[in-house]
Regions:
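Conserved active-site alpha-helix within GNAT-family acetyltransferase domains
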Residues: 94, 115-133, 139-143
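Residue-level recognition of the GNAT/N-acetyltransferase active site
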Residues: 9, 70, 79, 84, ...
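Conserved GNAT acetyl-CoA-binding A-motif
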Residues: 103-114
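A short helix-loop-beta-strand connector motif used in the catalytic cores of GNAT acetyltransferases and
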Residues: 45-56, 77
C-alpha cells in the first residue's frame, strides 16, 4: 500500500467531492446536506481547492481523505476533515489531524455536528474540548453543532481508569 499526503490540485476536485459527499451521506446522515451534489462539486472545484489549505490522503492513487484548513485572526481552523467510510479507523484521520496541527497556530478550532458522535469521540480523544454548543441556527444545515478547540499542548487526553 502506497500512502501519500499532498496538496489538493484541481485535478482532484471530483475525487475530493466524492469523499465529502459519501462521508456526509453515509456517516453524517443526521445532518442532511444543504446543497445538491452538483452544487457541492462546483464548490469544491471553484472555491475549496483554489482557496488553498486542502490536503488529500491518497492510497495507491485513490483519494480517500481530505483536510481543509484556514487561518483566522486569533486561531487556526479545521474547516473539513473527511474520509471515505471504509478508511475510518485506519489512522488516516489522526495523520490528517497532525498535518493540521503542524500547519496551524494554536488554538485550533473546528465545528462538528452534535449528532456526529463518532467524530466527536475522535476529536475528544485527540485533545479537543467542546467550548460551545449551538442550536444550529448559524450553519447551513440548521443542525445543532458544537465548537471544539484544541487542548493546550500540556494537556493530554484522559484515559479510562
Amino acid at each position: 500500500m502506497r500512502l501519500e499526503f499532498r496538496a489538493a490540485a484541481l485535478d482532484d476536485a471530483d475525487s475530493v467531492a466524492e469523499v465529502y459527499l459519501r462521508s456526509r451521506k453515509e456517516l453524517v446522515a443526521c445532518a442532511p446536506l444543504a446543497h445538491s451534489d452538483d452544487d457541492v462539486r462546483g464548490w469544491v472545484r471553484r472555491r475549496l481547492i483554489p482557496a488553498g489549505g486542502t490536503t488529500v490522503a491518497v492510497v495507491d492513487g485513490l483519494v480517500v481523505g481530505l483536510l481543509a484548513i484556514s487561518r483566522g485572526q486569533d486561531c487556526g481552523w479545521i474547516e473539513q476533515l473527511y474520509l471515505l467510510p471504509g478508511w475510518i479507523g485506519c489512522g488516516l484521520g489522526a495523520q490528517l489531524l497532525e498535518i493540521a496541527r503542524g500547519e496551524l497556530a494554536s488554538p485550533i478550532r473546528l465545528y462538528c455536528f452534535q449528532c456526529n458522535e463518532r467524530a466527536r469521540r475522535f476529536y475528544e480523544r485527540h485533545g479537543f474540548r467542546a467550548i460551545r454548543f449551538s442550536d444550529g441556527a448559524g450553519n447551513e444545515e440548521k443542525c445543532p453543532d458544537v465548537l471544539y478547540e484544541a487542548a493546550s499542548p500540556s494537556a493530554s487526553p484522559r484515559r479510562p481508569a
